[in-house]
């Protein structure tokens, strides 16, 4: 088992090399610090306590500050245990590179709070008839309906009734890791995860232990745009390039074609100037000959 703590940034969409659109959740995964290590001999189970996202010391009590000092780190805002995770020592950093593209993970977070909600929204019940006696008075369209038989004398537990909706811990299983960006501490996960923007998340390897999927081949939008621009430039200078080439190869070929075109234009200009000068000399000679002929006459 392996896991890491992160923060939800939001959702976006990316494109594969085949042109398919993939909805992903962007999770910021800053390096986590191992703040405590649980062992079988001492605690009865194996786990690592991870801490992420710095917080001011004045918001913590002295015992809590001392707990973080044991791992030689600053107080952390989000601290959670990852069961059955081992291989790290106190104070070590856990980074996003523990996951790879194509792996399946379980993401746990606190769902969005919806407040007090009726049974239609809370339990997806059917709306009542809007005619034949329904839709007003003693029979509103969105009423709860039956909550038990007349002889029961009580309401059984588990009946779908109005109440508080959301703001509870939820886990979505088997989400695919699309991309791991170590440089920016970003994890892209396919699909949606529980909670609003900026909520804290626990990302763990899938408990169902399903096989990893083939990594999605993504397209680099900036690179694709630059290649299109280079293709247009190649048409202008008559260079032969293809999309399969690397950018620096395309630039070298286009640069060589541009130099060749400039050279040809320069030669054409010089030839034109030479031709014009020859015409001027010829005209001057004809003029002198004509003057001589006029004097001889």
Swiss-Prot record:
Keywords: Ribonucleoprotein, Ribosomal protein, RNA-binding, rRNA-binding. Pfam families: Ribosomal_L3. One of its GO terms (molecular function) is rRNA binding. GO terms for biological process: translation. InterPro entries: Ribosomal_uL3 (IPR000597), Ribosomal_uL3_bac/org-type (IPR019927), Ribosomal_uL3_CS (IPR019926), Transl_B-barrel_sf (IPR009000). The keyword Isomerase does not apply. Signal peptide: none annotated. Residues 124-143, 258-297 are annotated as: Disordered. PROSITE patterns: RIBOSOMAL_L3 (PS00474). It comes from the Bacteria. GO terms for cellular component: cytosolic large ribosomal subunit. The keyword Nucleotidyltransferase does not apply. Part of the 50S ribosomal subunit. Forms a cluster with proteins L14 and L19. One of the primary rRNA binding proteins, it binds directly near the 3'-end of the 23S rRNA, where it nucleates assembly of the 50S subunit. Belongs to the universal ribosomal protein uL3 family. This is Large ribosomal subunit protein uL3. The gene is rplC.
């Amino acid at each position: 088992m392996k896991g890491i703590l992160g923060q939800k940034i939001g959702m976006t969409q990316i494109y594969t090399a085949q042109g398919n659109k993939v909805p992903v959740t962007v999770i910021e995964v800053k390096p986590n610090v191992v703040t405590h290590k649980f062992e079988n001999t001492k605690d009865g189970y194996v786990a690592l306590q991870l801490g992420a996202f710095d917080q001011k010391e004045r918001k913590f009590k002295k015992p809590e500050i001392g707990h973080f000092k044991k791992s030689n780190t600053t107080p952390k805002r989000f601290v959670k245990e990852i069961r059955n995770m081992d291989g790290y020592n106190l104070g070590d950093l856990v980074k996003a590179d523990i996951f790879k593209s194509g792996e399946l993970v379980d993401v746990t977070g606190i769902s969005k709070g919806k407040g007090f909600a009726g049974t239609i929204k809370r339990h997806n019940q059917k709306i009542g008839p809007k005619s034949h006696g329904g839709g007003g008075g003693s029979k509103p369209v969105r009423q709860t309906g039956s909550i038990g038989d007349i002889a029961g004398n009580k309401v059984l537990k588990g009946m779908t009734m109005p109440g508080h909706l959301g703001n509870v811990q939820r886990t979505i299983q088997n989400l695919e890791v699309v991309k791991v960006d170590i440089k920016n501490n970003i994890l892209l996960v396919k699909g949606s995860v529980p909670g609003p923007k900026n909520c804290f998340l626990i990302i763990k390897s899938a408990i169902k232990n399903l096989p990893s999927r083939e990594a999605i081949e993504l397209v680099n939008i900036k690179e694709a745009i630059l290649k299109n621009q280079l293709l247009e430039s190649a048409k202008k200078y008559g260079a032969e390039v293809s999309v399969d080439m690397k950018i620096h190869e395309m630039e070298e070929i286009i640069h060589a074609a541009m130099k060749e075109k400039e050279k040809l234009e320069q030669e054409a200009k010089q030839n034109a100037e030479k031709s014009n000068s020859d015409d001027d000399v010829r005209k001057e000679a004809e003029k002198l000959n004509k003057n001589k002929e006029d004097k001889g006459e």
